[in-house]
């Protein structure tokens, strides 16, 4: 761990410095040990403060004096006391960067435990009052849905809060590495996020940028697209929000991604969908085993099971929304649309 109290790691490949409100981490990727697969950049707030009390928060990647990429965190209404701003990670021999901007309401302790670091609790008072039984400890490790573990259930709650679903991918074929693999191609793939939504009363709708069917968060169908990344330049990809306060009104949500523009090449997109539910570990499903003759992937399904959320991995590929509709029996009527 490298921070203001320990400004260098043991081999000097990562160092920290700060001036005013600016903090700088210098990372020498060539000196990192071979077993280092990921470097995470985080921020925590002191006391009872949350990140929404900050005036500005962003992360910028530089090489020399050249700014390569940057991402700004939307702070309004955020309740987290600790955030993962982004990660530099090793994949297929290259170093890549992903902007995350997700975190934990509990601050440093759950953040540290997420990365496997134990943080001691505050010392108890000398004469503490009797405490109620502690709730079962929730594991904050990321959950990956796979063939071997295709589903997970989240315990029933009256209010799940704002459920956020993120689609992120590599836009172009480039030359590999941190720049080439992520940002260096003019032949970017426009990968779009979408959802089929069925409410408890049987009402069904499609939420996607295609056809400007962006949905609605506060009223039916309680699912809404957060814009459309047509340029491929947004570091955090595309987002779909589900109103967890109204989960009782939702029967199921089918999450999918489709290639609106570009030649299908699922293995090169390295696509991943991540589900973020407040106070729950992130749940991710990767777009693997892609069929390059098909432009749409049915990724996962969220099912209301007596008030709980069951997340099921699907990972099936189709030629389009209409073919997927027939496969799962939704019964929509389709016509050609555009963005």
From Swiss-Prot:
InterPro entries named among the record's database cross-references: Stress/Tellurium_Resist, Tellurite_resistance_TerA, TerD
Record-linked Pfam families: TerD
Keyword hit for Zinc-finger: no
GO biological process per UniProt: response to tellurium ion
Keywords, sorted A to Z: Plasmid, Tellurium resistance
Protein name: Tellurium resistance protein TerA
Keyword field contains Nucleotidyltransferase: no
Domain of life: Bacteria
Function noted in UniProt: Not yet known.
């Amino acid at each position: 761990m490298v921070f203001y109290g320990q400004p260098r790691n043991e081999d000097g490949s990562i160092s920290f410095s700060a001036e005013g409100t600016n903090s700088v981490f210098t990372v020498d990727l060539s000196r990192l040990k071979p077993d280092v697969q990921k470097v995470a950049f985080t921020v925590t707030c002191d006391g009872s403060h949350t990140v929404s009390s900050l005036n500005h928060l962003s992360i910028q990647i530089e090489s020399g004096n050249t700014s390569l990429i940057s991402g700004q965190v939307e702070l309004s209404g955020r309740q987290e006391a600790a955030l993962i701003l982004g990660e530099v990670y090793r994949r297929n021999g290259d170093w890549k960067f992903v902007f995350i901007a997700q975190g934990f309401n509990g601050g440093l302790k759950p953040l540290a435990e997420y990365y496997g670091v134990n943080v001691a609790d505050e010392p108890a008072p000398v004469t503490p009052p009797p405490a109620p039984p502690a709730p079962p400890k929730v594991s904050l490790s990321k959950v990956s849905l796979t063939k071997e573990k295709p589903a997970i259930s989240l315990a029933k709650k009256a209010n799940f809060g704002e459920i956020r679903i993120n689609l992120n991918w590599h836009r172009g074929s480039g030359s590999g590495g941190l720049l080439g693999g992520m940002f260096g191609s003019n032949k970017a793939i426009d990968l779009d996020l979408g959802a089929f939504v069925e409410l408890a009363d049987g009402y069904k709708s499609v939420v996607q940028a295609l056809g400007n069917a962006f949905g609605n968060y506060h009223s039916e169908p309680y699912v809404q697209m957060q814009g459309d990344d047509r340029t491929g330049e947004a570091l955090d990809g595309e987002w779909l929000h589900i109103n967890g306060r109204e989960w009782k009104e939702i029967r199921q949500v089918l999450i999918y991604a489709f290639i609106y523009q570009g030649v299908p090449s699922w293995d090169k997109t390295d696509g991943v969908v991540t589900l973020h539910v407040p106070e729950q570990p992130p749940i991710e499903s990767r777009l693997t085993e892609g069929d390059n003759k098909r432009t749409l992937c049915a990724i996962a399904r969220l099912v209301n099971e007596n008030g709980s959320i069951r997340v099921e991995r699907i990972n099936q590929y189709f030629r389009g929304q209409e073919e997927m509709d027939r496969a799962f029996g939704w019964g929509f009527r389709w016509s050609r649309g555009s963005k």
